[in-house]
Each structure stands twice: as C-alpha cells, then as structure tokens.
C-alpha cells in the first residue's frame, strides 16, 4: 500500500519525467529486451533494434499507462482494468515480465533523474510499480 509520502514522491518524480515519458518507456523496453532476452517472445512482429518505431510506440503506450496510473493512484484497479484484461486474456503475458520491466524502468529513471532519484523516491517508485504490476496481473487469477 502506498503511503501519502509515496504518492507525493511518485507524482513529483513523474512530473519531472514530463515530456520524456515515451522516450524513457522505450528505453526501459530496450533495456528489458537486452537484459532479459526471453521477453522478446511477446513481440515477434516487432523490429526490436535500437530506436525502432515499434519499440518507441510501445514505450509510449507503457508511459501513457503509467501516467494514467499516477493520475489515478487511489483507484488503479479501475483505471487499469482494460489493460489488465488485455494482458491477462488476450496477450497472456507471464506476470514475471512486469517485474522485469519495472526494474528496467527504475534503472532508466535513475539514469535520467539522478538528483531526484533519492533512496526515498526509489522506494516509492518501486512500491508504485509493484502496485501497477499487481493490478495488471489481478485478472490472471
């Protein structure tokens, strides 16, 4: 459960991401594909090379979903319900992959926002991404 301080930290950090959200989402996906090659199996139709339009496009989708989650931090299950259905029933993404992408997002944010990425913000973002992952995997049960 996110504390009030966590919510404040997450919103402040995401505000700093600003217009770079899609770019950071794509970078996190690239990191995931390089670090955890098995994740590529969900994207057989994508050009997974550095800077590909498809990875950038999906990175923007990831960032948009996170922006939605930040904006509805007190009601993520409702806000992300359609996305949860999509990943559970149509795409059938293994839930572990959300943890892998979350890790890569944290690394990407730390690389781009070193001054803002304090231990407290790191912990809050980690809890937030874990909450998003829990919501996205809730329909698997």
From Swiss-Prot:
Q: Which biological processes are named by the entry's GO terms?
A: hydrogen peroxide catabolic process
Q: Which residues form the Globin domain?
A: 1-141
| Pfam families listed in its UniProt record | Globin (PF00042)
Residues modified to Phosphoserine = 3, 35, 49, 102, 124, 131, 138
| Binding residues for heme b | 87
CDD domains assigned to the protein according to its UniProt record, in alphabetical order? Hb-alpha-like
What family does the database annotate? Belongs to the globin family.
The entry's function note states:
Involved in oxygen transport from the lung to the various peripheral tissues.
**What PANTHER family is this protein classified in?**
HEMOGLOBIN FAMILY MEMBER, HEMOGLOBIN SUBUNIT ALPHA
Q: How does it assemble?
A: Heterotetramer of two alpha chains and two beta chains.
**Name used for this protein in its record:** Hemoglobin subunit alpha-1/2
